[in-house]
């Protein structure tokens, strides 16, 4: 189509420095949301845009924001430096991600446009120093932005020109309603605003009335998830809870799931139970949760994206169950403490090249399923979603399928063709491993990991800043070992491999390494001449007695 050809990045009137940054990122063409939103934003219109997760919403507001700021500095009257752009996001991780994207797009104009993120867990004094320099764009959560506004370390009433609310449908459910209303009192009467959301609900409608002025609504006609040619979605019915653990063990140990995978569970306790269970079989994983320091969570995501880990267990108590309005959640499902209410996993976080999403626990809402599934099959890459379902959860599964199917009444979640009787030989192993993962073991594992991550996060912060290469050596998937680990469980004998898979799969076996104590002993022995010296003397042969 001619119209679509006329709306490439090079035809949007963008600054050459932005075009160069877009080229460096490897974006040959804008996504649908970018193609529609950027020209309208450059015309000065308020936008209410809905697009599915992974569709490029961040760049859809970041590019016009940078273009408008650069154009103003190049053609407008000379005015003092001030904060002119504000980006509000529901979680610290999303704030860091938004800042990173804006900085990448501003690579060639970094002197003209500066970006600051004030949501990180730093002391307010250091953040105040950053804000005193008056960056052009400030990114943060509503609570942290409001705190700086109340302390007068951030002033927006006379300077703000652009306001962005990203993942708008989550802000109220994360408990930011009061902060948002208070924050708006510190803004000028006139400004351009963008509201970006994956879904349109009552919360988004309320935000629209609070923030937008005669907006253009972009409700793109696209499915909430990629089509079956890109994203394959399966369900597998497990008769018991034990069957779920058994099936997961077989999928991972026999390498039936290839590439990087995300395992979603509904509670923090379940995530550690699953990690300790897999640890019994020498399957390394790491848990991403809100109890860990922000630096540790971001480091885990970064290393996962770089290929350090093949499997991450994720939990996001903030988006499970009914939204809590007007207050922060103190506890998630089954009493899990949400120690960091601004930590989020299932929505918006950019995991790179995820081959498979495994819903070990059925998502509590159809929307949660969409957000989880959106972690794979991004940027035209293929992906698989496999959902484990108990017989008692069939009704809830039907609700998810109803939302996914829409007008197309065909089945979306196809049955996963797997014969459980083929892996019955592994059941006794799984049962043995499940028994050893007690509540006490889970408590000890959580405490141990939090202590270690706090140490890594705080004590080594300055060291890693001076020695960035050593940061790559810091692992988050090392065994916790509060449960009794039986070494033989890490090995899969050939007779246990299902007949249909023999010769096709090779259960990955970890190369045996000498323990540090063995290596030290061997080195000490080789360096000690008294212990390493060997003398081969002539053997004594008795002479024959004369007769």
UniProtKB/Swiss-Prot annotation:
It is found in: Nucleus, Nucleolus. The modification Phosphoserine is found at residues 126, 532. May form homooligomeric complexes. Interacts with IRF3. Interacts with OCT4 and POU5F1. This is Probable ATP-dependent RNA helicase DDX56. Residues 506-547 are annotated as: Disordered. A motif (Q motif) lies at residues 7-35. It catalyses: ATP + H2O = ADP + phosphate + H(+). Gene3D superfamilies: P-loop containing nucleotide triphosphate hydrolases. Residues 506-525, 532-547 have a biased composition (Basic residues). Keywords: ATP-binding, Helicase, Hydrolase, Nucleotide-binding, Nucleus, Phosphoprotein, Ribosome biogenesis, RNA-binding, rRNA processing.
